[in-house]
Amino acid sequence: MGDTPIHVAYPAAEDPHLRIAVGACRLTAGPAGDAEWVAGTYHDPTDGRPLRILEEETGATITEEQPSFGRVRAALGGATRYELEFGKKRPFALTIETGASDFDLDLGGVPLSRIAVRQGAGKFELDFSQPNPARMELLEVSTGAAAIELENLANANFSEMRLSGGAAGYELDFGGTLAHDAEASIETGVTAVTVSVPASTAARVAAETTLGSVDVGDGFTTKEGAFLTEPALSGVGPVLKIRAGVRLGSLQLRTT
């Protein structure tokens, strides 16, 4: 019932791909230095899910011998845990695939070219506390009944963002510095979605609802069927375009 160290060196590829495919667990991750691509610790109190690390020229996969995608065990000390740090030496693509897990990631300053997240249930928190030094082609998050909290999304430096999910709560904060034009698409079912945008960011939000509701706070002006911040009305700076398809839930728009 001990800890297993994790050490993954940078592969030969210029833009490598890191895939994390794990069962129900708790995972925290943050930025590190330049020495290693991935470093950290894996803790399995059951000794029943041995760690597997597959390293190839194009990237690496962190997974388990027999991943369990059920609920995170609530018993004291019963949940497997990952504590990871990502290097900042070279840009890379990141894929996360998991079941009913609790994820808490701060990827501020980590050079990411692409992120794909597929999670069944649980909780997923992602923060970009510092700007991404690389241009991110796509940020994609797909969930089942997972509660999602994404912070400082402008710092992710994405060109396109796609978020889809079922019955859960979504809090999306587009804080940070918007370095270029970006588009975000949100598609949810029976979900409460809160979208927050800095008042200084040029943002255009198009809401699409079936039986859902839209609550628009101060700082937005309706124009041509969309909700625009003052910088967007004035044509100042890069523009963040958000399409929010909230079919049966509620959408709240706020400026910060």
Model segments located where?
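Hydrophobic beta-strand segments within beta-rich accessory/binding domains
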Residues: 18-20, 28-29, 94-96, 104-105, ...
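Right-handed parallel beta-helix
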Residues: 95-134
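Short, surface-exposed interaction patches in beta-rich subdomains
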Residues: 4-9, 39-54, 58-78, 85, ...
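Extended intrinsically disordered, low-complexity coil regions enriched in Ser, Thr, Gly, Ala
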Residues: 31-38, 107-108
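N-terminal segments that cap or nucleate solenoid repeat domains
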Residues: 1-32, 95, 99
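A common structural microfeature
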Residues: 15-17, 26, 35-37, 48-50, ...
